[in-house]
Each structure stands twice: as structure tokens, then as C-alpha cells.
């Protein structure tokens, strides 16, 4: 039989059972620690016991289920609101797989990143460059969608934080500042300026919060300003990231458009040598169309680049186009039908060249839409006059199209027709230019070329007015002096 070698005192055992496991208590509403204060051993023990109590309370299976249900509902509400916005105001985005994929990739990536950082305590959430979201969406899409996507993502990320209000306010303001300060991105210096402005907005707003909640400037949390600085530096990586996203999702940024619009580009240089008249027409058009697009809130850099490349197909048969002819007209040896086919082929030839030189789809769209589904009217009318009794097949004289389906394409079509027609005016007076612009654009409107694009009558009136002013300046119009009556 084994006998115990050590027996505790009954008195000690009885007394020890009365000893409390706690070594202090915290009253309801009592302040544990203030921002900027040093954590001593006593405070650490209180905070640690608070953490354990939270974990204990969250261990309940029922509570976990309810928490999960609440999170799913929370996420679902904001995703529904964002998709409703797209349906109401950007329904065309549903037809672009790359657009939706990019938006939802951002919506998934940033909340997941935030959750990992908070759960693993990797670093402060404020080093994450959330302002990169509106920059990316603004560059590839539009500012309104950029703001909506940014707010949605910030609200989804805030679910991972215990005290999200300060986070939400800081990030929403920083996003608004980023959108406003970066209306277009064509140079690296623009992004540097935006990163600086975003850092300043973070710092000023956080400083305002501290002034509101603190009564002692010595307690300011300087570490947060270091986080904001790191955030601004990381924001600069948006520039190389844009190139990667372009390739993955099939977008075209202003940076790429600026590079393409360089007239030393091999394709444009070749056009200036092979079809110099067409090249000069494209340059004039680029300035005219870009100014008009900017006036009505369109993408001026996109229109400028599209204008430079819209007629590259004329390089295949340059002599068949009047601006490249020098006294000899090769159409005289062709029938009207054959001539029409040669003229129409500059669209298909242009698309082939664009494909060969890897031009973006948005530029190819300008090539295919700048004549829409219009007729080669000169040859069609000439053929019709020679064969008045014949039922003419219009498709032989019609461009393949389609008609313009964006505001920028509509502006390009108007600029193309007006600039080309203005060269044939017998005299350049204010009246002749005004009449020409009105006649050409009113005819395009009446024939339904712009029915499929989101351009308004107000936009068209603005474009007409700008074209008149620009053409008057280009051709140095003079006032027509009245004749003296006898």
C-alpha cells in the first residue's frame, strides 16, 4: 500500500480556496488607457484580461453563426448597392468582361488583404495604399465608378476592424482627393503629385481627429504619420501596376495613348512618308477632335490618338485619295463600283494594319466607326445618275461600320467630315464655314449616325460651335465686305 509522503495543511487548503484568481477590477465606463500613454505592467494585465474575455465570449458556436450571418448580410448589402449602381448608370460595363473582372478583383483583393493583416497583426492597416483603388478605376473607367468602387471596398474592409469609423473617414477623403487630383494619367509626375496630396490629406485629417479627441499635444501619435508616409510611397507603385493590368484585362491607359500619339512612332512616320496628305489631315483632325472632346467632357487623349490612326488604311492605296493626289486621278480608269470598293477598303486595310502593329481595341474601334454605315456618296450618286432606272444595291457603296457607339467616336466622325470638306471650300469666310459645319453635322444627325452613342444635342451644338471657331482660326477668315450700291 502506497502511503502519501506529503500532506497539506487543512487550514492552508481551506484558506487558498478563498483566494480570488483576479488581482484587481475595472469599473463600468472606467478609462483603461489613453492614446499616447505608456503601457505599464498593470495596464498590460488589464488589456490582456480584456482580450481573453472577448475570446471567451466569442467562443460560443451560436455567436459565431450569428457573427458570420451578420458579416454575409453586411457584405451582401454593399455588393448589391454597387451592382445596382452599375445597372442603373453603367449598364454597358456588364457587356465588358474585363471591366467587371477588374472591379470584382479589386473588391475581393483589398478586403482579403485587410483581413489577413488584422488577423495576423502584420502591420498597421494604414500602410495599405487604398487610394490606389480609385486611381486604377479612374484611369481605366470613369471618376464616378472610381468613387463608388472605392467607398464599397472601404466599407467592406472596415468589417475587419474593431473601431472602423476613423478608418472609413480617412480612406473616403483620401479617395476623393486622389480622384480629383488625377483626372488623367499621362506622366509619372502626375502620380507623384497625387501621392503627395493624398499623404497631406491623411495627415491633416488625422491631425484634426487628434485635436478633437486629445487635450495634450504631447500625446500625439507620431507613428501614424510614418504609416501615412509609407502609404504614399506604396501608392507610386500604381504606375507600373497599370501596365500589368492593361495586359491582363485588356484596357488602355492614357500613358499608352500618349506613347502611341508620338508622331515618331514607326507607323505614323511611315504614313507621313507614304501618304503625306492623309498624315496632315490626321494631324489637323487630331487637334480639332481633341479640343471638341475636351469641351464636352470626353476623353481628349483617346480622341487625339484615334484621330492619328483612323486613316492608316489609306497607306495601302494612297493615290486613290484626293489629299495624296498630285494631278493624276486613278479613279478615271475604274468604274464607280470599283472606285467605291477601293475607298471602302481603307477601313478593312486599316484594321489589318492595326492588328499587325498590335494597336489597342479602342483605336481599332475608331478605324471601323469613323464612317459608320455611311455611303460613299460621290460614287453612289454618280452611279445612280448614270443608271436612273436600275435598282442599285447600296451595300456595294456602303462602309462596313458599325456606327459610332461612344461619345469620342461621334466627335471623331464629325471632325473627319468637317475637316475634309473644309479643304474644298471656294472661299473661307465666316458664313461659308458656319454653313458647312451646320450642313455636314445636321446631315449626320438626321441620317441616324449617332443613335447608338451617348451624345446629346447640347454636346453636338457645343462641338459645332467649337469647330466653327477653330476652322476660322485655321483658315484666317476675313469679313465679307459689302458691295457699294450704285
What does each model-found stretch correspond to?
Residues 10, 14-26, 42-53, 120, ...:
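Hydrophobic alpha-helical transmembrane segments
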Residues 263-430, 434, 443-447:
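Divalent metal-dependent catalytic cores for phosphoryl transfer on phosphate-bearing substrates
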Residues 193-200, 222, 226-227, 262-263, ...:
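A glycine-rich phosphate-binding loop feature that marks nucleotide/adenosyl-phosphate handling sites
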Residues 1-8, 13:
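Single conserved hydrophobic/aromatic residue that forms the stacking wall/gate
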Residues 17-112, 120, 130:
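Non-cytosolic juxtamembrane linkers/loops
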Amino acid at each position: 500500500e502506497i502511503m502519501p509522503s506529503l500532506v497539506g495543511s487543512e487550514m492552508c487548503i481551506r484558506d487558498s480556496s478563498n483566494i480570488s484568481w483576479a488581482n484587481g477590477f475595472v469599473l463600468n465606463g472606467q478609462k483603461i488607457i489613453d492614446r499616447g500613454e505608456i503601457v505599464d505592467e498593470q495596464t498590460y494585465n488589464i488589456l490582456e484580461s480584456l482580450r481573453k474575455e472577448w475570446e471567451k465570449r466569442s467562443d460560443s458556436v451560436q455567436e459565431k453563426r450569428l457573427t458570420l450571418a451578420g458579416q454575409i448580410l453586411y457584405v451582401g448589402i454593399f455588393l448589391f448597392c454597387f451592382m445596382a449602381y452599375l445597372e442603373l448608370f453603367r449598364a454597358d460595363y456588364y457587356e465588358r468582361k474585363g471591366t467587371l473582372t477588374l472591379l470584382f478583383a479589386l473588391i475581393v483583393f483589398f478586403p482579403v488583404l485587410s483581413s489577413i493583416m488584422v488577423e495576423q497583426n502584420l502591420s498597421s492597416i494604414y500602410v495599405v495604399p487604398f487610394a490606389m483603388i480609385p486611381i486604377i478605376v479612374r484611369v481605366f473607367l470613369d471618376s464616378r465608378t472610381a468613387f463608388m468602387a472605392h467607398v464599397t471596398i472601404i466599407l467592406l474592409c472596415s468589417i475587419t476592424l474593431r473601431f472602423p469609423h476613423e478608418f472609413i473617414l480617412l480612406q473616403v477623403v483620401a479617395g476623393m482627393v486622389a480622384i480629383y487630383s488625377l483626372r488623367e494619367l499621362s506622366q509619372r509626375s502626375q502620380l507623384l503629385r497625387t501621392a503627395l496630396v493624398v499623404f497631406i490629406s491623411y495627415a491633416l485629417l488625422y491631425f484634426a481627429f487628434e485635436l478633437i479627441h486629445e487635450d495634450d499635444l504631447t500625446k500625439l501619435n507620431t507613428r501614424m504619420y510614418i504609416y501615412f508616409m509609407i502609404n504614399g510611397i506604396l501608392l507610386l507603385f500604381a504606375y507600373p501596376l497599370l501596365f500589368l493590368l492593361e495586359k491582363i484585362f485588356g484596357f488602355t491607359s492614357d500613358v499608352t495613348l500618349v506613347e502611341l500619339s508620338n508622331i515618331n512612332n514607326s507607323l505614323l512616320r511611315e504614313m507621313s512618308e507614304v501618304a503625306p496628305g492623309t498624315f496632315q489631315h490626321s494631324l489637323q483632325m487630331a487637334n480639332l477632335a481633341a479640343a471638341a472632346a475636351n469641351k464636352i467632357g470626353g476623353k481628349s487623349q483617346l480622341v487625339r490618338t484615334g484621330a492619328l490612326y483612323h486613316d492608316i488604311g489609306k497607306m495601302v492605296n494612297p493615290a486613290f485619295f484626293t489629299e495624296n493626289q498630285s494631278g493624276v486621278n486613278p479613279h478615271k480608269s475604274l468604274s464607280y463600283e470599283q472606285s467605291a470598293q477601293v475607298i471602302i477598303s481603307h477601313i478593312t486595310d486599316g484594321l489589318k494594319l492595326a492588328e499587325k502593329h498590335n494597336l489597342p481595341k479602342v483605336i481599332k474601334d475608331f478605324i471601323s466607326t469613323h464612317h459608320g454605315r455611311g455611303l460613299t456618296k460621290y460614287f453612289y450618286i454618280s452611279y445612280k445618275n448614270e443608271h436612273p432606272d436600275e435598282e442599285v444595291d447600296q451595300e456595294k457603296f456602303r462602309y462596313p461600320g458599325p456606327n459610332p457607339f461612344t461619345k469620342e467616336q461621334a466627335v471623331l466622325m464629325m471632325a473627319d467630315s468637317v475637316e475634309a470638306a473644309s479643304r474644298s471650300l471656294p472661299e473661307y469666310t465666316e458664313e461659308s464655314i458656319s454653313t458647312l459645319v451646320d450642313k455636314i453635322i445636321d446631315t449626320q444627325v438626321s441620317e441616324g449616325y449617332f443613335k447608338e452613342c451617348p451624345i446629346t444635342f447640347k454636346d453636338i451644338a457645343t462641338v459645332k460651335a467649337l469647330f466653327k471657331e477653330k476652322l476660322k482660326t485655321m483658315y484666317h477668315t476675313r469679313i465679307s465686305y459689302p458691295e457699294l450700291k450704285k
